[in-house]
Amino acid sequence: MEPLSHRGLPRLSWIDTLYSNFSYGTDEYDGEGNEEQKGPPEGSETMPYIDESPTMSPQLSARSQGGGDGVSPTPPEGLAPGVEAGKGLEMRKLVLSGFLASEEIYINQLEALLLPMKPLKATATTSQPVLTIQQIETIFYKIQDIYEIHKEFYDNLCPKVQQWDSQVTMGHLFQKLASQLGVYKAFVDNYKVALETAEKCSQSNNQFQKISEELKVKGPKDSKDSHTSVTMEALLYKPIDRVTRSTLVLHDLLKHTPVDHPDYPLLQDALRISQNFLSSINEDIDPRRTAVTTPKGETRQLVKDGFLVEVSESSRKLRHVFLFTDVLLCAKLKKTSAGKHQQYDCKWYIPLADLVFPSPEESEASPQVHPFPDHELEDMKMKISALKSEIQKEKANKGQSRAIERLKKKMFENEFLLLLNSPTIPFRIHNRNGKSYLFLLSSDYERSEWREAIQKLQKKDLQAFVLSSVELQVLTGSCFKLRTVHNIPVTSNKDDDESPGLYGFLHVIVHSAKGFKQSANLYCTLEVDSFGYFVSKAKTRVFRDTAEPKWDEEFEIELEGSQSLRILCYEKCYDKTKVNKDNNEIVDKIMGKGQIQLDPQTVETKNWHTDVIEMNGIKVEFSMKFTSRDMSLKRTPSKKQTGVFGVKISVVTKRERSKVPYIVRQCVEEVEKRGIEEVGIYRISGVATDIQALKAVFDANNKDILLMLSDMDINAIAGTLKLYFRELPEPLLTDRLYPAFMEGIALSDPAAKENCMMHLLRSLPDPNLITFLFLLEHLKRVAEKEPINKMSLHNLATVFGPTLLRPSEVESKAHLTSAADIWSHDVMAQVQVLLYYLQHPPISFAELKRNTLYFSTDV
């Protein structure tokens, strides 16, 4: 199931909140960071993580948002007659093909749900029934009707898509599908009872419990997986999910359908019916979001919930935090034995009337948080990527489902640890009657959302109170039913048919902003989701004393399964009394924030795409383009052999009559002169426009190079050096030797590894070898300053390894099948190769060439 928040569908939160009194496998997370982690149980299917962006607010409706991300009650405009009609119709085909594939999966899921119904009915009239006729009719209510509706729809749509031409019409099929939504209304009304009945029957009948825990869903026709095991509980949820997906497709189809096309009015009508249906469902469901009453007798409602990392007793714990209309409650999911209803355990609560945010001065006095070592976080990411690759290989080779489940469990455990240990941005709250609490977040956007939601509620006339033990028990008990976020935000919780996100490089130019009421010192930061959570990736310069900043700064952001881009606009604080000594304590004022989805169809083009994000009356203009991982593997030789970028290193050194290219020597010299103590040197991106300017100067062999280098930001110089190595026609350690490096680093015997790795260095062409040894010694000198610059040998190997050593384009095509694989394939080994040489005693070019075998006394 794809993330839904960005589509602006009316009141989407109903999908998550709908009768949420059932459990999912990954809800059995261990809230205590120091206890053994639990992954999803075998055979269970988990709901995907739902983004908590503002468009997912329980109070959101299409009419209340007034533009922005919300969708107006009227359908989106189609293509004007004759305007890019051919392109639009081709997009229609792509949209329909994707929907048809997911429709096939849905029909297979319904078939799997219906499969046990007939034998259960057959036993119902015997002396030993598994279920009664009444129980069967309750659990499987309307499933047969829904199956027949969608089977007919699929059978009619499939030939139209397979035999596609520009004149094909299918609007009448969607119109008919929408007209049958009454069946779904009946299903939804019965849904809660169906789940309760299924749960009771599972507890009282072992035979039915076995059936309901492992239903076999047939894989799609083209899939190598013949069957997957899914729980009945998860399958009963599928029809609810399907209504929303069908409505999303109608939006997409209308967007790419010419207004004068015969399908256009039919699709409009289908969308109108679907939206009315969703609205009516929301009206029915909203009352179920209520919990107990407030001290003033008003209904207490859940406003926001989500998973946050709390620092408690000097260790990190994953908590589920619930914000009600008058209280903030921090809870942990209790561990329960199989078959028992899951419950939350309240760790603490603060009435909003007593909740205050500490000032920067007060925060400074509180205990500071020591970040988790970067190299350990990188190791976790490498393990996760390697496990993803293994899972893909197992699936491709039709591996055993148990083996795949074991790998998935390992991946979940590593993702959980990464989620627990990576956040560093403090979010401090204080109970004016006592204790303070500290959460760590990875995103300032998310911290701002929590703060704003609390402050908005605090504007009301709130009263202080103390909950009795019974009241607290009732409130905590309601959390399981009311929660809107069911799973911790890790990628292993995604459905197989859900978009894996984008892997590659996103180039973003932040142009300008307007709409500020007065002049200020302004800058922007960019966040993207990575490994299931958001992280800050780039920051513009501060534009001083202006109401209309024009940054025009370009950034290259690496995407790792990313689906969203966030832009935050800040006013810089120069008042020393307000500046916190904790580097992670951002005290600058957020002026606005916004988020867009990284739609593959929009960004996966070679051209720049310009857009505007609106935030609190502020408009930020930016452009972006995306380069996929497989495209970034391609090294394009320079057309003009007079430059240095994209030109063979042997050609450059011969032309310059040097052993190491001039660009490498100059960049290294400048970094060692004034950047060796720069925090995050080589890891933090330089401004892309500065890097491109330096590239042009080096390519032109301009006489002003040295002057320009001395004035340029040091991160731009470091970025230029990395870009030079990345744009070599082949990697510095060569395509030819790549497989041998991979085999050498995998050797177990230290002596054999030593001889192999040194022999491989000797096999490099002289310009490559001398340049590599020169770079090696430089990186070692950078790592000597690790206490100051925070760049260890491991960090530097992570940055440079995949640049100096990567598979050739031919090998990539031969072995890799997906973007995620391209990212993860051999990355760990590439890092380990460079790390091996960085940790090795100094390597002499002369000694390497003198010895046919290289022996080390350390082995």
From Swiss-Prot:
Region of interest (Disordered), ranges: 26-84
Keyword set includes Iron: no
Effect of residue 859 to A: Abolishes interaction with DLG4. No effect on synaptic localization
Gene3D superfamilies given in the database record: C2 domain, Dbl homology (DH) domain, Pleckstrin-homology domain (PH domain)/Phosphotyrosine-binding domain (PTB), Rho GTPase activation protein
GO cellular component terms listed in the entry, alphabetical order: axon; cytosol; dendritic spine; glutamatergic synapse; membrane; Schaffer collateral - CA1 synapse
Keywords attached to this entry: Cell projection, GTPase activation, Guanine-nucleotide releasing factor, Phosphoprotein, Synapse
Site note Arginine finger, residues: 683
Domain DH: 91-284
Matching Pfam families: C2, PH_19, RhoGAP, RhoGEF
Domain PH positions: 301-459
Localization of this protein: Cell projection, Dendritic spine; Cell projection, Axon; Synapse
Modified residues (Phosphoserine): 57
Domain Rho-GAP: start-end pairs: 647-845
Molecular functions per Gene Ontology: GTPase activator activity; guanyl-nucleotide exchange factor activity
Role description: Protein with a unique structure having two opposing regulatory activities toward small GTP-binding proteins. The C-terminus is a GTPase-activating protein domain which stimulates GTP hydrolysis by RAC1, RAC2 and CDC42. Accelerates the intrinsic rate of GTP hydrolysis of RAC1 or CDC42, leading to down-regulation of the active GTP-bound form. The central Dbl homology (DH) domain functions as a guanine nucleotide exchange factor (GEF) that modulates the GTPases CDC42, RHOA and RAC1. Promotes the conversion of CDC42, RHOA and RAC1 from the GDP-bound to the GTP-bound form.
Subunit structure: Interacts with DLG4.
Name of the protein in question: Active breakpoint cluster region-related protein
Organism encoding this protein: Homo sapiens (Human)
Phylogenetic lineage: Eukaryota, Metazoa, Chordata, Craniata, Vertebrata
